[in-house]
């Protein structure tokens, strides 16, 4: 089920209208048939047959939401990796999907580009868009995710909060490395009141401060 649609029985056009996909490599997403970022975002909207006024409105909204207005007249292939990935996301977001699926969108980006993309994801969730992301950067998952799907060999192992997932005792056997903060908390046996290990630094500092342990 995606956005209330049974993908086994629903027409593909309906499913693709409800769910947008952003690939791991932005070079695979950018069409290359347009010369500017503005035109690239317009490409999908034009194929949808939307009125000109609606196309312009959606492009303007996407430029602001993805914070790429300053590069709207540049060629997408002249941008940094983080900027190019934001353009790829903008092109999909402009089509107003209910669900946005991101396939390891930061795997080929440097730390700055990765931070840019995660900030964008945070803004999109505030706009009411459901985000499903395949990602291996555990610190980022701990910081930004509301819920985590833990898979092993394509089988669902657990679906819970980042705290609950990273507090599991079987992570090593599943090949999952918890965030550094959680690993330290486990080593020190510092748990929160709910029995879970903290996943963010400020939480661990708070636990240490409660016991008067120096932590600066």
Segments predicted by a language model, with ranges:
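Conserved ABC ATPase "signature" C-loop
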Residues: 153-154
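Conserved ABC ATPase signature
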Residues: 75-79, 83
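Conserved ABC ATPase "signature" region
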Residues: 42, 46, 53-71
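ABC ATPase NBD Q-loop/coupling interface
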Residues: 1-14
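H-loop/switch region of ABC-family ATPase nucleotide-binding domains
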Residues: 135-136
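ABC ATPase nucleotide-binding domains
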Residues: 167-216
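Catalytic Walker B motif of ABC-type/P-loop ATPase nucleotide-binding domains
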Residues: 100-103
């Amino acid at each position: 089920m995606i956005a209330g649609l049974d993908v086994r029985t629903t027409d593909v056009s309906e499913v693709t209208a409800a769910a947008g996909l952003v690939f791991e490599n932005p070079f695979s997403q950018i069409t290359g048939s347009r010369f500017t970022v503005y035109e690239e975002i317009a490409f999908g909207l034009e194929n949808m047959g939307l009125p000109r006024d609606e196309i312009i409105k959606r492009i303007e909204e996407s430029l602001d939401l993805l914070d790429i207005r300053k590069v709207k007249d540049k060629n997408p292939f002249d941008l940094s990796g983080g900027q190019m990935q934001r353009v790829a996301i903008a092109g999909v977001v402009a089509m107003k999907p209910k669900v946005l699926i991101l396939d390891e969108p930061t795997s080929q980006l440097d730390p700055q580009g990765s931070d840019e993309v995660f900030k964008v994801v945070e803004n999109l969730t505030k706009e009411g868009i459901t985000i499903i992301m395949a990602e291996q950067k555990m610190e980022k998952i701990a910081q930004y995710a509301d819920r985590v799907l833990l898979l092993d060999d394509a089988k669902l192992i657990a679906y819970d909060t980042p705290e609950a997932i990273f507090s599991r005792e079987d992570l090593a056997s599943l090949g999952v490395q918890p965030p550094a903060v959680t690993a330290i908390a486990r080593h020190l046996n510092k748990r929160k009141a709910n029995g879970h290990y903290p996943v963010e630094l400020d939480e661990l500092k708070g636990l240490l401060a409660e016991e008067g342990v120096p932590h600066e």
